[in-house]
């Protein structure tokens, strides 16, 4: 009976408590606890964010709170924090006691409340350069400036999953780590700095919003709107995503978007106005600096026009010899290529156009090397601006007049071409080269004729004024002028007139550079012979000086040598008179210091006696040679004298011309003995010298008489200079006769040798 009773009791117990009822209870308990953790997750996240942004900042609870304080402390997720104020509890009701399948996302916004902005102040934002940018003014339309936006959301799983017993403590520990990182990050964000900067000035506000509802930016400056407009590529905001917490019911996520600028401050209206003025001044200054005149950013049109002529020119090649000549070029007209009013390219002193318009030629027959050196000098000076920045290319841009006839001195450089406009009377510098000095001719008369008629700067510049110092009593300058007065070295073929010069300038310059170089190479043997002759002359000169040293007298000067040679010539004349009764007195002047500069005279025979005397006087005046160094003419007959050294005396016979009432009468033949050392192969050509005309202006006739007339017109200003030249010749003759009377006999005839084959004409 007792056993039956026990079996009945066990059956009743099993009927009230089935085997699966315990498992279901445990499952429901786990789901309820996980749901509570998810709900507290939203609350705890809002509490951490609001505590770091809200006013006043709550104090950290103590480790051993009292019973009253413990009731106000939130201990969830192992973070002891003061409970959320009652004002915010109503906003959090939406996330309490709600089904997880319908729980909405939570949005927490932190903003600057502009409603309490003082009337006399303005909220500004400072950029990286500490320039203020106006954010909002008092009583404006914008009442809020959004600084950051937090998003807390839960994504439920689409499939049902069983909550495991060990899952709850794992998810809880993951949430603890996440909240601790958020707690530290909220105090490192820009909004926390804004809270410190605007403390007791402007409060920060917070909003808890339903993430399922649209967010309106009306009446406030939204998070997506930039305040500083200078940023082009980089954004004014950034986003941060935290590590999510995964559960069997769903995933918990937290992210934030915030402004990177935090330099918000309040400025007085007057202070802001002055700062705006200062900022505008700085911007204008930067614009002026960027648009100011510089060698790289100045007038593009000027740069194009000034560089365009250079592109059409071949590469510049420097001539191997510093050969200069004075040639007359025909007038060439060219339109102006500059634009008035443009700024200068470089900050250099302006150069007058009269000095820029001078073309420099290398050869006397207007060969192509004329244009090559002229192009070289123009390119070298094209970057130097004048007042109107006009690059000169063989033209006068203003008046359209012809280009002035060019000249070149013995320097072969730009020193003699460009004249300083501040000092118009500066003496030009000369650098002589003995190898090429015989190829130059310098005439102040032709320079006077070649003065340009107009100036780019509106000034009356003159070549005469620029070269007025050429007549100074300078021994070196006189020596150079004497050298430059001799005949020119011809590089090319026969001479051509003005039309030939124009034709040669239009030919390619590079081919003529090669021709000039070949011509110089062909003259190597002659220059070698010239060098040997100079060396021999120096040796003879040393012998002569050693012979004179026996007299215990110092080295003779130019005048002493001149007097000595006059004595030698007197002795020579006495010997001639004793040998032949028909021999007349013959005088010769020898320039001991620079006698070899008379070489390289080409054969030419003047056909008129007037032209002979005119040529002598013009050469003396153009070179500014003193009477003691001029080549005089004396009455007599030529004679031959044998000498032991290579010294040359060229006898030039002519007739003395005198005019009375327009009638010309011829007197006895005159003979000029030009003495000089044998320094050139042309000296040994025993023919009467003929002076080649190198100043060809017209090519109508090629006869010698017309060439002589044209040369006379260029070297003189008129026929009236003939009489003055005759008077000067007479004075020189008197001076020579006086020296002959005072001279004594001298047996030393080392430096005297006459031309054996000279003849009268």
From Swiss-Prot:
GO terms for biological process: autophagy; cellular response to nitrogen starvation; DNA damage response; mitophagy; piecemeal microautophagy of the nucleus; protein localization to phagophore assembly site; protein transport; single-species biofilm formation. Its main location: cytoplasm. Residues 1-25, 277-367, 398-456, 488-507, 544-642, 691-761 are annotated as: Disordered. Induction: Expression is induced during biofilm formation. GO terms for molecular function: protein kinase regulator activity. Residues 600-613, 710-720 have a biased composition (Basic and acidic residues). Pfam families: ATG13. Keywords: Autophagy, Cytoplasm, Protein transport, Transport. Belongs to the ATG13 family. Fungi subfamily. Interacts with ATG1 to form the ATG1-ATG13 kinase complex. This is Autophagy-related protein 13. It comes from Candida albicans (strain SC5314 / ATCC MYA-2876). The lineage of its organism: Eukaryota, Fungi, Dikarya, Ascomycota, Saccharomycotina.
